């Protein structure tokens, strides 16, 4: 699901070849109507000569959207007499770079991921005057944003969405396994046990499921956290202290997962990262996997026969319901910036409907909507195979649920405690021991 590139791009881009196609077309479409807006903003430079802004964010999987963001930033800068630079880092390098900038300076605007607003709360400018109007005029925040975008009563970043995954599957192989409505994923509503049963038949036919359970930031927690919640367990209760992980229903759910892993999955997945399942799916090795729409976009470019045979379903549900692990991404301003007024002016402009809408639509559903207005946006109806992604925000929970997505939740995530609980269970075969281990690890973090 995730695209872990090495190094940063500044001035020129380095992208996977299969995503370069169509960039020009998207760029032209996204630019339509932008110039008049810029001319309105350019009546006179708003800031003193020599003002500079540096923006840091994670690299984009959808390359044309990254190109568009750079153009938007540069044109606003030219219209307002501000020199803007944009850096895009591979995802694992983003947080360390932000930490360095907090200490020594260097960036004005940074992209924050889940829990980072808590981590750097003393170093961020309150931007409620930008975020709240954006949310209100667009129908309010989606659930996952509402749960996480504030630290107490402070708004320390402006939410712009989240990229997430669903269950990609091969239509023909699900048909062979007897799955009803296999040709239309939007009509399929499965429990985990039903999903495992289909996988068992697919594996018997030589087409196992695939799931990454290694130390990787996207796909492993993207399945393990929702599965945990769907069987009634949580890291902590609402008080943010009481461990709620070792529950009988979850232990039983883990037993079902162990059985499903053996019956339905490629068992080498315990060592897979976010890229292994992409390759396995695109090579025809597996019939279904949790992944972002990146697999589908890649297939449309390089493997059209696989794209034609691919659809998506919502993540399965358990006895406690259906859940998605979603964390809010925000654009934040560092307090040590020497150009806070310019940074706020840029964000206020970028989050206007025209600029934000063009950027969000250019990703064709890869980025989930942060506000409710975009639930009915035409982009969701261009390709029926993307329909399940539109529904995900209503099921979103954050890391650390039912407590806040704070530093402790981020630490538990970074240590892969929930993911390793699943890996230990399928490797050792003892659900109870694995869950007890996970609960003990969580106590060490939340008990501090």
Regions found by a protein language model. Name each.
Residues 1-17:
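N-terminal secretory signal peptides
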Residues 44-47, 112-166, 196, 223, ...:
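Hinge/lid segment of periplasmic solute-binding proteins
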Residues 44-48, 128-142, 183-188, 211-213, ...:
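Short, solvent-exposed loop/beta-turn-alpha elements that line the ligand-binding surface or hinge
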Residues 47, 52, 310-313, 362-420, ...:
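Long, aromatic- and glycine/proline-rich binding clefts that accommodate carbohydrate-like moieties
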Residues 49-61, 83-87, 109:
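Short, well-ordered beta-strand elements
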Residues 71-143, 150-157, 172, 176-182, ...:
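Extracytoplasmic "Venus flytrap"/periplasmic binding protein-like
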Residues 152-160, 165, 193-243, 249, ...:
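Extracytoplasmic/periplasmic solute-binding protein
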Residues 194-202, 239-271, 315:
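Glycine-centered hinge/linker elements that transmit conformational signals in sensory
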């Amino acid at each position: 699901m995730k695209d872990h590139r090495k190094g940063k791009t500044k001035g020129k881009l380095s992208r996977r070849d299969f995503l370069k196609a169509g960039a020009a077309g998207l760029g032209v479409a996204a630019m339509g109507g932008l110039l008049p807006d810029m001319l309105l903003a350019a009546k006179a430079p708003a800031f003193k000569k020599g003002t500079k802004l540096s923006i840091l964010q994670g690299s984009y999987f959808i390359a044309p959207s990254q190109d568009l963001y750079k153009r938007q930033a540069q044109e606003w800068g030219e219209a307002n007499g501000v020199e803007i630079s944009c850096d895009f880092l591979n995802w694992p390098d983003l947080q360390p770079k932000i930490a360095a900038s907090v200490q020594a300076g260097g960036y004005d605007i940074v992209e924050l991921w889940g829990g980072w607003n808590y981590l750097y709360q003393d170093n961020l400018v309150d931007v409620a005057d930008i975020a709240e109007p954006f949310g209100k005029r667009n129908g309010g925040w989606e659930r996952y944003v509402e749960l996480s975008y504030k630290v107490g009563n402070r708004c320390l970043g402006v939410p712009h969405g989240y990229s997430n995954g669903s269950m990609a599957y091969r239509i023909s192989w699900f048909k062979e396994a007897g799955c009803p409505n296999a040709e239309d994923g939007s009509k399929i509503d499965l429990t985990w046990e039903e999903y495992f049963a289909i996988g068992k038949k697919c594996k018997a036919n030589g087409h196992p499921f695939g799931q990454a359970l290694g130390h990787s930031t996207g796909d492993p927690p993207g399945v393990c956290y929702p599965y945990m919640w769907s069987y009634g367990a949580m890291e902590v209760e609402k008080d943010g202290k009481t461990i709620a992980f070792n529950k009988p229903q979850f232990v039983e759910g883990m037993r079902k997962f162990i059985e499903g892993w053996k019956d339905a999955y490629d068992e080498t997945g315990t060592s897979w990262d976010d890229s292994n399942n992409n390759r396995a799916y695109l090579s025809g090795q597996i019939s279904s996997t949790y992944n972002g729409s990146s697999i589908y976009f890649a297939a449309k470019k390089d493997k059209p026969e696989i794209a034609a045979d691919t659809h998506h379903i919502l993540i399965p549900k358990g006895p406690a319901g259906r859940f998605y692990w979603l964390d809010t991404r925000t654009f934040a301003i560092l307090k040590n910036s020497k150009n806070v007024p310019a940074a706020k002016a840029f964000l206020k402009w970028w989050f206007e409907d025209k600029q934000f809408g063009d950027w969000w639509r250019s990703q064709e559903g890869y980025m989930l909507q942060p506000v409710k207005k975009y639930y009915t946006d035409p982009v969701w109806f261009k390709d029926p195979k993307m329909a399940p992604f539109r529904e995900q925000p209503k099921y979103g929970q954050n890391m650390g649920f039912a407590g806040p997505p704070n530093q402790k939740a981020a630490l538990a995530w970074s240590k892969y405690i929930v993911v390793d609980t699943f890996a230990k269970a399928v490797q050792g075969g003892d659900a109870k021991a694995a869950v007890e281990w996970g609960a003990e690890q969580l106590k060490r973090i939340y008990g501090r």
